[in-house]
Design a protein with these regions (language model features):
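Intrinsic-disorder/low-complexity, polar/charged segments
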Residues: 60, 136, 191, 244-245
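Short, solvent-exposed coil/turn linker segments
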Residues: 108-114, 197, 218, 258-261, ...
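Acyl-donor binding region in acyl/amide transferases
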Residues: 1-70, 175-239
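Amide-forming acyltransferase catalytic core, primarily the GNAT-like/NAT-type
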Residues: 48-180
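C-terminal functional modules
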Residues: 230-275
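A short, terminal or domain-edge coil/loop segment
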Residues: 82-94, 212-216, 238-239, 263-275
Length: 275
């Protein structure tokens, strides 16, 4: 856990903090919410950026409703409440013009996933990453329990994606908030099935009434995200990793590392309760 400290401009506090963060022989430190100042400090002592994960994707389902939802509460008080009602038919019309850009992938279905099932499947779905969390059932259950307490973004929800044989090929974890934004924490997939998993997820999120969905980019997801219309990327925060292990550094550079969501900081109430 790295906090924010203040020091006099002429003092050596910043340098001492940086030196204290230098990795030990076999340690790995990472952060997925680093500011430019923090990123520069970490790079000065050997830290590396994790490819793509500084980006947040935003997939819009109902453009006018999503735009109104982004307006500040202060501004919304000055807007006729009827605009929110007007947005629905306008978005429906835009949806017809847009056409069927969210067709469900053939043979894939989205199903409810219990926490015990998620605890059983999650390690298998990230096993192909060279650097990944070695979650035990107790550890992952503890994380899920804490994340579920964060209700500011919506209801903590887990869904599985199954193929025509009813085998689980992926799952996604998100804060559900129909009529608002779905905040996606994790998208887990067997290697090579990411495009189908993403397509099924976006179809489900639109069908359940969300205006838009947001989540973190990852190298393995870029092909599937790139196929989506009405999707944009924006810088969110730097994702950084710090280690002295050469093999781990190589994996970081090529993006063969799984961090973020439950394996990161986005679920923490510290990240959203004070915004």
């Amino acid at each position: 856990l790295l906090g924010v400290f203040m020091t006099n401009r002429d003092s050596a506090g910043a340098a001492q903090l940086n030196l204290g963060l230098r990795p030990k022989k076999a340690s790995l430190s990472f952060c997925d919410s680093a500011s430019p100042t923090s990123a520069r400090s970490l790079m000065a002592i050997g830290g590396k950026t994790i490819p793509m994960q500084n980006l947040e994707w935003v997939r819009t389902f109902r453009p006018l409703g999503a735009l109104l939802g982004r307006l500040s509460p202060r501004l919304l008080r000055r807007i006729d409440p009827g605009l929110a009602t007007l947005a629905r038919p306008v978005d429906a019309f835009l949806g017809r013009l847009r056409g069927g850009d969210l067709e469900s992938p053939a043979g894939l279905k989205v199903q409810e996933m219990s926490i015990p099932d998620f605890l059983a499947h999650a390690p298998r779905l990230i096993a192909h990453y060279a650097v990944r969390p070695l979650w035990s059932e107790d550890e992952l259950g503890w994380l899920v329990g804490l994340a579920a307490q964060n209700t500011r973004l919506g209801a903590f929800t887990i869904r599985a994606i199954v193929d025509h044989t009813s085998a689980t090929i992926g799952c996604f974890v998100y804060y559900a908030s129909p009529g608002r934004t779905a905040h996606v924490l994790n998208i887990l997939s067997l290697p090579g099935r990411e495009v189908g998993v993403l397509g099924a997820m976006f179809r489900h999120l639109e069908d359940t009434g969300h205006l838009e969905a947001r989540g973190r980019a990852q190298p393995a997801l870029m092909a599937g995200l790139g196929l989506q219309r009405w999707l944009v990327f924006r810088h969110r925060a730097f994702a950084m990793a710090l280690t002295r292990v050469p093999e781990v550094n190589d994996a970081i550079v090529r993006g063969d590392i799984y961090v973020g969501g439950l394996a990161g900081e986005d679920w923490s109430r510290l990240m959203c309760d004070f915004g």
